[in-house]
UniProtKB/Swiss-Prot annotation:
InterPro entries: ATPase_csu/dsu_sf (IPR036079), ATPase_V0-cplx_csu (IPR014272), ATPase_V0-cplx_csu/dsu (IPR002843), V-ATPase_V0D/AC39_subunit (IPR050873), V-type_ATPase_csu/dsu (IPR035067), V-type_ATPase_csu/dsu_dom_3 (IPR044911). Component of the A-type ATP synthase that produces ATP from ADP in the presence of a proton gradient across the membrane. It is a peripheral membrane protein. It comes from Desulfurococcus sp. (strain SY). This is A-type ATP synthase subunit C. It is found in: Cell membrane. The keyword Ion transport applies. Has multiple subunits with at least A(3), B(3), C, D, E, F, H, I and proteolipid K(x). Keywords: ATP synthesis, Cell membrane, Hydrogen ion transport, Ion transport, Membrane, Transport.
Length: 364
């Protein structure tokens, strides 16, 4: 009897230990997202509606544009706008996006912050590439700096640099030093330089995603691979339109995507390249905008961006207490700010409101 009781007690102890472990694991996985995701959901409700965008398109002046945003979350960022130039408005909108990232770092669980830091590094890559290209083209580099990223002071110093060699000193000790040195030595051209920057960036994103577990890995890996596919598809199609060969295009592509682009690279025309994509998982996305793509590839860029957001939103519904919610919000916020920037530029250029509404809807 005592042996039976002992076995029973041991079994109960094992069961309770297992239940305790599973409960603790569930709490560890999901509870940290309860507060931030609830807060983000409240913020999502404040994203601008189509009606609001139409109202902004009717502004006619940038001063009215700013006034029409006073009842939104952009009010504080636009408070210092005084000369009402498009550059001033754009800088304010960039600060708003930076504020979104800062909030994510503040409210998200510690284990999630690393991915958003890597996303922010993507703005470093964009800034570095733009500054270097501007310098090589003898254009004012500061005009191409976005007020966002983890190394903004260095980027601004690069923009002010008098020589290309001075930029190398500024980049010393960063992950970008070696590839920039290759550019200076003439070992690679500026196109390959930019490709290498983005290869490093997406490589880091993918490595991070693959290092995660469970739903976090599913969500982040899906996002990164979709993002790589988007870049590669657009790069390949632009190159095909420019008449480049498969051998010229291959070094421009980023590893880690899901779409096999080799058949596309070896076809003879842009139309045939689009036809090759028809049998991929992006076939429907492309078919929906096929006619417009032939005139303007930015239409496909917008469609692919929207597809990524929709996919992350689907994952958010499946994993409501996860990193999908903040990721979805940041992507929507970035899209919103791109649209606001486009409207501001069109207003400054004197475009009629109805045309602004039409063009703003096409912004990626």
């Amino acid at each position: 009897m005592e042996a039976v009781t002992g076995i029973l007690n041991t079994t109960i102890a094992v069961v309770f230990t297992w239940v305790g472990y599973k409960t603790a694991r569930i709490i560890w996985k999901y509870t940290p997202y309860s507060y931030p995701n609830a807060r983000i959901k409240a913020m999502e409700a404040k994203l601008l509606t189509e009606q609001k965008f139409n109202e902004l398109a009717e502004s006619r002046t940038l001063q009215n544009f700013v006034v029409n945003l006073e009842d939104t979350d952009y009010k504080d960022y636009l408070a210092d706008v005084s000369s009402y130039t498009v550059e001033e408005v754009e800088k304010a909108l960039e600060r708003a996006l930076a504020g979104t990232y800062e909030l994510m770092f503040k409210i998200l669980p510690k284990r999630s912050k690393g991915f958003f830091e890597l996303l922010l590094e993507g703005w470093d890559v964009r800034n570095i590439a733009n500054v270097v290209k501007a310098k090589l083209a003898n254009e004012p580099a500061s005009d191409y700096v976005v007020e966002l990223g983890t190394m903004l002071p260095k980027v601004k110093a690069m923009a002010e640099a008098k020589t290309l060699e001075e930029i190398l000193v500024i980049l010393e000790g960063t992950p970008y030093e070696e590839v920039y040195q290759k550019l200076l030595l003439g070992e690679i051209d500026v196109t390959r330089f930019e490709t290498e920057l983005y290869r490093m960036h997406y490589g880091k994103l993918l490595s991070y995603a693959l290092s995660r577990k469970d739903d976090e890995r599913i969500i982040l890996e899906e996002f990164v691979r979709l993002s790589i596919d988007r870049v590669n598809i657009l790069t390949a199609l632009r190159a095909k339109k420019a008449g480049l060969s498969a051998e010229e295009i291959k070094p421009m592509l980023i590893p880690g995507g899901t779409v096999k682009l080799d058949p596309l690279l070896h076809v003879d025309s842009f139309d045939m390249a689009l036809a090759e994509l028809d049998s991929t998982k992006y076939g429907q996305v492309i078919r929906d905008v096929r006619e417009e793509i032939e005139k303007d590839l930015s239409v496909l860029e917008k469609a692919l961006n929207d597809h990524i957001i929709e996919r992350i939103s689907e994952l958010e519904r499946f994993y409501p207490l996860s990193i999908a919610t903040p990721l979805s919000y940041v992507l929507r916020r970035e899209r919103e700010i791109r649209k606001l920037r486009a409207i501001a530029k069109l207003i400054e250029n004197g475009v009629e409101p109805e045309r602004i509404k039409e063009l703003a809807g096409e912004v990626a």
